[in-house]
Each structure stands twice: as C-alpha cells, then as structure tokens.
C-alpha cells in the first residue's frame, strides 16, 4: 500500500506558483464570496484566503448575511465581473435555500469562474476542450494526484461513488476525457458492490463516514477518498482506511489527501484566469 500524499504535492504546487508570482507585474486576485455564517464554510473560505497569501496572491473575502436578497448577491457578482483587477470569483457553496445556486453560477463571468461550475466551463469539459476550460477544483486535484504517482487512466475501470454537481459529475467527464471506462454510483444504484468490486480506481465522494468497506474493493485497487465527516470529534472519510489500506495499491488519507489538492488547484485556476486576462 502506498499513500497518495496530497499534502506534499499541494505544497510543491504552491511553491511553484509562489515562484512564478514573484515575476508578475501585478498579483493575481481572488474574491471569495460567503453567504451566511456556516462554520464549516467559514473554515473553508479562510483556508482559501490564507492559501492566496501563502503564494503572494491578492484576495478579498466578501461576506453577506444568510438572509441577503438574491438580487443583492447577483448584483454584487456582476460588479466583480466588471472589476479589471479581479481575476477569480468564487462563491462558497452551499447557499441558503432562498438563493438559486444555478443563477449565482450563471452570473459569474466564465473567464473568472475559477470553481469551473459555469455552464460554459462545464461545456468545455464535456467537449474535451480542457486547455481553455476551468476544471472544477476537486476533480482537477484528483487528476494531478494520479499524475504525480504515474497512475494512468487509459482503459482503466473507474468507479465514482457519488453523483454530485461539485465532484461526481465533472469528475466522471474528466476521467472519460482521459479514456477511462467510467461508472457512477448514486443513491438509486441497485448494487453498488457490483461496480466498486471491479474498479481499478475507486473514488468515493458522498460524505457518508466509512461507507466503503474492504469487501467492496478489489485487491490492488487505487482508492481515492473525497469524503470528509466528523465522527467523535475526529475527521474521517468515506473509506474504512484501516482495512482497505491492506488491499489497495494506493490510497488517499483523510485528512491530507484530496483536501489540500482542492485548494492548490483553486490557486492554479486563479493563476490561469490571470494569464488569460493579460
């Protein structure tokens, strides 16, 4: 069993970005928009703002009360679209129920959509125009982690557990672009084990603690755990790490696997947005 160490790769990516930023005429700028006071979201956005500082980016955190009117938020995003010095705009998800996530995403200028969720960027991902797309951060982080350990996707059976908008759906399309044979399991999948057991690469993104047990995984599989939950005050993933690490050829830890890569790829996307704008 080998550990897919997202923490060390993210550190390397951040170091390379920091060196590059030193030679730029102006600092790339990311604006993070947070609606409400959800503690987990607050931790995530503070991590993103800190990561910007670590590599020499400029950043701005715009916070709104949870009962902010949808139009007020949309108009704020439109004003950020117009600001020449803003390269990336990220609206932290989830949003309160009275605000349409789709409307918010659609309002972000696609050239500043560093989360990669705008239909234009999703369309480029779907069509295979990866060079010009902003690929959503977690799927991109997973791909870079696989690359770092020379894990080829071509012809591999990839099973993704979780069909969410943020990870599962875009990840399935990204894997297809690299010639993997992809199956996606969700809450209506009748026999998940039938799919997980044949996977060369198994990726779980459900947020259900210890959902993936050792009997669901084939010997020598690569196992990537995107899930993050708290159980008895401890951060855990979707995967029963102790038992599955005995069977897997490679496995990500939680924490220290996919999480740091998601932040590192946000920085990569922001730098890409900056370069496309100059």
Curated annotation (Swiss-Prot):
Superkingdom of origin: Bacteria
Entry keyword annotation includes Amino-acid biosynthesis: yes
Reaction catalysed by this enzyme: (6R)-5,10-methylene-5,6,7,8-tetrahydrofolate + NADP(+) = (6R)-5,10-methenyltetrahydrofolate + NADPH; (6R)-5,10-methenyltetrahydrofolate + H2O = (6R)-10-formyltetrahydrofolate + H(+)
Record InterPro entries: Aminoacid_DH-like_N_sf, NAD(P)-bd_dom_sf, THF_DH/CycHdrlase, THF_DH/CycHdrlase_cat_dom, THF_DH/CycHdrlase_CS, THF_DH/CycHdrlase_NAD-bd_dom
GO cellular component: cytosol
SUPFAM superfamilies the record matches: Aminoacid dehydrogenase-like, N-terminal domain, NAD(P)-binding Rossmann-fold domains
Keyword NADP applies: yes
Keywords: Amino-acid biosynthesis, Histidine biosynthesis, Hydrolase, Methionine biosynthesis, Multifunctional enzyme, NADP, One-carbon metabolism, Oxidoreductase, Purine biosynthesis
One GO biological process term: L-histidine biosynthetic process
Pathway recorded for this protein: One-carbon metabolism; tetrahydrofolate interconversion
Annotated GO MF terms: methenyltetrahydrofolate cyclohydrolase activity; methylenetetrahydrofolate dehydrogenase (NADP+) activity
Pfam families named in the record: THF_DHG_CYH, THF_DHG_CYH_C
EC number: 1.5.1.5, 3.5.4.9
Cross-referenced CDD domains: NAD_bind_m-THF_DH_Cyclohyd
Binding-site positions, NADP(+): 162-164, 228
Homology family: Belongs to the tetrahydrofolate dehydrogenase/cyclohydrolase family.
Record text on subunit structure and interactions: Homodimer.
Function: Catalyzes the oxidation of 5,10-methylenetetrahydrofolate to 5,10-methenyltetrahydrofolate and then the hydrolysis of 5,10-methenyltetrahydrofolate to 10-formyltetrahydrofolate.
Protein name per Swiss-Prot or TrEMBL: Bifunctional protein FolD
Upper classification of the organism: Bacteria, Pseudomonadati, Aquificota, Aquificia, Aquificales
